[in-house]
């Protein structure tokens, strides 16, 4: 059950509301939504951000504030995705602390000029096994368009594509742990 939600609407008309969202079992704060500059003829895209205060199994005196970002980038043009990434980096680079950035990036890691690689480099984020097999999230051709990226100080302990059909893409799930926190040395890492 996810009692805490934050939804940002990036495109709306009489027929639909498109956007991004975050769902959590735990309350979050500092939530905001950002819609990218319009990129006609495709619908507007954007991202939402919220912070969760995480205190793994009570092992820390004070919780760690982790920022979670849910994003949806343009599906049709690499140039638009790159512009959206630059817009997003301009905002997210000003946010301090650990970050988990996830969503539908509509791009892969394989190409030399990958927008995803560019984003990871700009924000110093890491992806889970970028060349791994069996993690496709779209279609029957093995396209991996949906990703989770994490900042230094966090690490993946589990990562999987959820086989349930909930949209035209499969969801991605990860277990993320706090890495090398001095208060956690000698004990199992906290997981989120």
Task: Briefly describe each language-model feature range.
Residues 65-67, 99:
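The start of beta-strands in P-loop NTPase/AAA+ ATPase cores
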Residues 35, 79, 83, 90-99, ...:
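Metal-dependent phosphoester-hydrolase catalytic domains
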Residues 32, 69-72:
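Short beta-strands and strand-loop turn motifs
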Residues 20-22, 47-51, 70, 147-148, ...:
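Conserved hydrophobic/aromatic beta-strand scaffold that supports enzyme active sites
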Residues 71-73, 103-105:
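Active-site metal-binding loops of divalent metal-dependent hydrolases
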Residues 15-20, 77, 108-111:
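Short catalytic/ligand-binding loop motif for oxyanion handling, primarily in non-cytosolic enzymes
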Residues 1-65, 160-163:
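Structured beta-strand-rich core segments of catalytic domains in phosphoester-bond hydrolases
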Residues 53-58, 87-94:
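A generic secondary-structure signal
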